[in-house]
Amino acid sequence: MTTSKIGVRHAGHGHTVNIKYGYIIFGVSVLYALLLASAHFLELRQWRRQKRPSRSSVWARINNAPFWVHTLLWAAIVVGLAFTNVHDLSQNWTVVVKRLGRLAFCLVPLDLALALRPCLLGQSYLELMPLHKWLSRLIILAGVVHGIGFFVKWTIHHQLGKAKRWANLAGIIVALFSVLLVIVSSRPVRRRFYSYFYAFHNFTVALFVLLMIWHARPGVSDFVLLSVALLLFQGASRVYNGYSVPGLTIVDADAASLRLLRLQKPNSFPSVWQPGSHIRVGLPLSSWQSWVFPAHLYTLCSSPANDTLNLVVKKGRRFEMLTSLEYRVSCPYASLPTPWLSTAENVHIVCGGSGISLGIPLYEYFDNKSSVLANLHWCVSNARDTFVLSELGVNNPVNVYVTSGKIDQSSYDDADNEDAGLLGAGDNIELEPIPAENKSNPFTDDHAVNCAEQRIQMHAGRPNLSEILASFSETDDNAHKLLIVCGPVGLIRDVRAYGDAHGIAVFSELYNM
């Protein structure tokens, strides 16, 4: 009688050894999410108790660490786990290749959680969006290396026919769509075709999650179910936290580049929200387009006491709202960290173009507090845009700087058009000084009278930050000074540089004018 030795499937190739590393990185991601949520909560609690921000506390350092620090941390974790306990790499390199695929997919739940709206970690999801984007790229990179590694393995062993098997083909499909996603997510493509990028992004995510049911071996059904649950939560949240708009009024002015949209407030809309909050506006759920293309982010330029939800938008946007169509809005999302509303004593707000929609509600809130010194500075390329101040009933003093001339695109370049209401559609605000020969009053007499009645101080040319922010010197403690900037990237860069140079906290939001 002859005996034969039964070999173990994929003997020596770590077929099951990588399972635990998937659970390890998932456990690390859970701890990481808890750390982010805890750091955010504890920093704000400490801030409220001390009535001043503490930039040196460990919680503040974690909560305010640049996104690239988090990205490098996760890259180090993935690489470290990929090579842990792998001896004689020349013989066991396929273990690393297999492990990278599992590590990539087990990070998907964290990546989805970072993009949830509203965010479950306490922060504004806008704060976590850069981390979501770069973690997605890290996942794709690990997945692509995983795929290339298998092609190399099959080529060496003359087994390219394995690529035709459905389980492997599913992985190839995911890899191809992931590479395409990286291409369409590049800045030029994303800015120009954001709605299509958004649809392709969501399709690729769904494809990635579902095809892993067949591709991953051993299976990852638990991670698939968790990922599907997060996607369903996002869909349910969109339904539950949305409100149908009864009607829309468009307020326009001749020769102005901005317009005012007045949305009738839905009956069930929240009765309280923080000044400077955002809403998303899209088509009703009955429209298939609302499920395929993105809703658009706008800043609420109104208070809870108003009967309408007021939005200041740039004319000629890709997303044009019409009175003949129905719309749906989300619940308000806060932007400015809440403790600033009670601890700031000297506030300057610098806006560019439609960034005034964030500036007005915050300015009115701070200016109506007797203990706060508040100033609003607004840069516009068209003096006629100031009509929105009278339409919104702004009676507080406002400094308006009317600029002209083309600007250097490399200096004031548009940023990504990822939220077409808040982040604009590709036209810059002009911030260059008016040439000396043109510095006569650029306003008509009627316009000058209206501005005087509204306590608006009109200035020609780009503002000098050192001059307009000089009143910061009236407050000794920098911990109670706040500089808010909302506008294009160039304006934000200059204001941030001023804040850093003078030790003043800066809160910024990007608006492409």
Swiss-Prot record:
Keyword terms: Electron transport, FAD, Flavoprotein, Ion transport, Membrane, NADP, Oxidoreductase, Transmembrane, Transmembrane helix, Transport
Coiled-coil annotated spans: none
GO molecular function: ferric-chelate reductase activity
Spans through the membrane: 22-42, 66-86, 103-123, 138-158, 166-186, 193-213, 219-239
Family annotation (InterPro entries): FAD-bd_8 (IPR013112), Fe3_Rdtase_TM_dom (IPR013130), Fe_red_NAD-bd_6 (IPR013121), FNR_nucleotide-bd (IPR039261), RBOH/FRE (IPR050369)
A GO cellular component entry from the record: plasma membrane
Domain Ferric oxidoreductase: 100-211
Annotated membrane topology: Multi-pass membrane protein
Pfam families on file: FAD_binding_8 (PF08022), Ferric_reduct (PF01794), NAD_binding_6 (PF08030)
Family in the record: Belongs to the ferric reductase (FRE) family. AIM14 subfamily.
PANTHER family tied to this protein: METALLOREDUCTASE AIM14-RELATED, NADPH OXIDASE
Functional summary from the UniProt entry: Probable cell surface metalloreductase. May be involved in iron or copper homeostasis.
Name listed for the protein in its UniProt record: Probable metalloreductase AIM14
Organism whose genome encodes this protein: Clavispora lusitaniae (strain ATCC 42720) (Yeast)
